[in-house]
């Protein structure tokens, strides 16, 4: 059976009358379009294998059109079988196949018609004036051992009216189509300025989350993850973290930090006195923390129980929190074990004035003093901003902004200290908590005076701080005046 198939396959090649019949001329081949249909049944690369079942009229028109154009390299592959079969028609009219013995098995074509169509294509493409086709060339090309490269998969054509979705979001009306960009070789038709701006836009889209502030722990993207820590180091503080975590609204404002807890806004840094120095460098990791360098002058306003301090870095003018271990007191008393530590609480208030009183205690006495001083200033008293420092030793009023002002508007420098044993009473106004006053006694004469202050918020924390100082002072006084150690010794 194999011998008969071989003889049937090679019969059109070795019989010379078949060549004479096909090499008669170009005019005779135009009248036989069936040879072209038999040779290339799947010539259209984009059509499926089932396109061979279409009408003969469309196939005839395609076959005749192939004769009018220049001969090109064509490849036919059986996509349905997937066996890698390839039939190549080169520009010189030669036929190449990967597997000549399998080709007649998969394609139910007449071998004689195929060879006739191939020879007719060669003679008609040359206009009938070319030399006769040799048999040896055909037998070499039809050999089963002929090597041929596999045709690469054809990619879909780039649509010309399709624009990039990213360019559309970036204002893609100014950009061309994708086909024009590839045709111009990477945007040759686009101005360099537009291309550079386009690259920057792509960079911001891909890496925008690295520079954007929405990547912070307070952003909506982080909050959408669920139960995530906000990142504030004061969130677990026993004190009110809202007051200890001021948010900076505008970095270019004249006062870069909001008012502190129980104080007025910091208008000038000169009025603040440095209480601590930076001992180590501290790099902030959250919004409510401030940066510290070694030797920075720091005004510590409050120290929480979790060993975090709230204060102002006088070098940078920023207010926030920082660990207490990164700052040291200016007196360096912490290094002296014999010196007892003194707790100090500082508040920024507006000093309105002092009036003499007849009694040494009572809320009514403070209200009467406030009414008298506010009546002199009017409905909106301003006062002189100063720092009220509360400690176990006493109350200190400090204001160092006077010498730095102009001579015309120069105010007296305030630096007064009242020993706690001479302070008899302290209370805030029951109706308006912004006003507070404390009564002091003259050291040698039986006379009393009430000192009135005003804060931007409620002054209840100031009164409570004075009350705690009284308790500590009284405890020390009892231990000194009535020692209990002597009782156990006896």
From Swiss-Prot:
Subcellular location(s) of the protein: Cytoplasm
GO molecular function: identical protein binding; kinesin binding; MAP-kinase scaffold activity; protein kinase binding
Amino acid composition bias (Polar residues), ranges on this chain: 231-249
Matching Pfam families: PID, SH3_9
GO cellular component: axon; axon cytoplasm
GO biological process, one term: axonal transport of mitochondrion
Domain PID: 344-479
Cross-referenced InterPro entries: JIP1_scaffold, PH-like_dom_sf, PTB/PI_dom, SH3-like_dom_sf, SH3_domain
Region (Disordered): 1-71, 213-254
Tissue: Expressed in the brain, CNS, PNS and cells posterior to the morphogenetic furrow in the eye imaginal disk of late embryos.
SH3 domain mapped to chain residues: 271-332
CDD domains according to UniProt: PTB_JIP, SH3_JIP1_like
Transmembrane segments: none
UniProt keyword list: Cytoplasm, Developmental protein, SH3 domain
Free-text function comment from the UniProt entry: The JNK-interacting protein (JIP) group of scaffold proteins selectively mediates JNK signaling by aggregating specific components of the MAPK cascade to form a functional JNK signaling module. May function as a regulator of vesicle transport, through interactions with the JNK-signaling components and motor proteins.
PANTHER family found in the cross-reference section: JNK-INTERACTING PROTEIN 1-LIKE PROTEIN (PTHR47437:SF4)
Complexes and interactors: Forms homo- and heterooligomeric complexes. Binds Hep, a dual specificity protein kinase in the JNK pathway, but not its downstream target bsk. The C-terminal region interacts with the kinesin light chain protein, Klc, and the C-terminal PTY motif of amyloid-beta protein precursor-like protein, Appl.
Recorded family membership: Belongs to the JIP scaffold family.
Entry protein name: JNK-interacting protein 1
Species this chain originates from: Drosophila melanogaster (Fruit fly)
């Amino acid at each position: 059976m194999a011998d008969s198939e071989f003889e049937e396959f090679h019969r059109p090649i070795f019989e010379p009358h078949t060549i004479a019949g096909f090499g008669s001329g170009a005019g005779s081949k135009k009248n036989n379009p069936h040879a072209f249909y038999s040779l290339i049944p799947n010539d259209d690369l984009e059509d499926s294998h089932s396109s061979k079942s279409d009408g003969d009229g469309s196939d005839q028109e395609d076959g005749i059109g192939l004769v009018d154009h220049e001969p090109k390299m064509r490849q036919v592959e059986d996509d349905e079988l997937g066996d890698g079969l390839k039939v190549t028609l080169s520009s010189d009219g030669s036929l190449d196949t990967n597997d000549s013995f399998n080709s007649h098995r998969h394609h139910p074509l007449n071998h004689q018609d195929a060879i006739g169509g191939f020879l007719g294509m060669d003679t008609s493409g040359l206009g009938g004036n070319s030399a006769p086709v040799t048999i040896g060339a055909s037998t070499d090309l039809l050999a089963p051992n002929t090597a041929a490269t596999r045709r690469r998969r054809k990619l879909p054509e780039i649509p010309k009216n399709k624009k990039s979705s990213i360019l559309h979001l970036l204002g893609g009306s100014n950009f061309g189509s994708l086909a024009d960009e590839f045709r111009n070789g990477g945007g040759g038709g686009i101005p360099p300025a537009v291309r550079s701006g386009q690259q920057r836009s792509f960079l911001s889209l891909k890496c925008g989350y690295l520079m954007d502030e929405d990547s912070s722990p307070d952003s909506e993207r982080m909050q959408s993850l669920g139960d995530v820590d906000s990142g504030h180091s004061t969130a677990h503080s026993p004190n009110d973290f809202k007051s200890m975590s001021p948010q900076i609204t505008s970095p270019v404002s004249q006062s870069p930090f909001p008012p502190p807890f129980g104080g007025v806004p910091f208008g000038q840094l000169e009025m603040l006195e440095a209480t601590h120095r930076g001992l180590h460098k501290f790099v902030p990791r959250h919004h409510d923390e401030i940066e510290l360098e070694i030797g920075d002058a720091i005004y510590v306003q409050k120290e929480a129980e979790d060993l975090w301090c709230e204060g102002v870095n006088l070098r940078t003018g920023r207010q926030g929190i920082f660990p207490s271990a990164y700052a040291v007191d200016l007196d360096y008393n912490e290094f002296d074990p014999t010196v007892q530590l003194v707790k100090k609480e500082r508040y920024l208030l507006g000093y309105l004035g002092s009036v003499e009183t007849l009694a040494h205690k009572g809320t009514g006495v403070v209200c009467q003093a406030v009414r008298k001083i506010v009546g002199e200033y009017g409905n909106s008293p301003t006062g002189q901003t100063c720092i009220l420092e509360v400690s176990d030793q006493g109350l200190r009023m400090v204001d160092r902004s006077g010498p730095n002002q102009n001579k015309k508007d120069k105010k007296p420098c305030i630096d007064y200290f009242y020993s706690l044993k001479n302070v008899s009473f302290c209370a805030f106004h029951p109706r308006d908590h912004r006003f507070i006053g404390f009564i002091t006694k003259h050291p040698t004469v039986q006379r009393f005076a009430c000192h009135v202050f005003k804060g931007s918020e409620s002054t209840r924390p100031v009164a409570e701080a004075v009350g705690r100082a009284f308790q500590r002072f009284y405890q020390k006084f009892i231990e000194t005046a009535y020692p209990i150690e002597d009782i156990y010794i006896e």
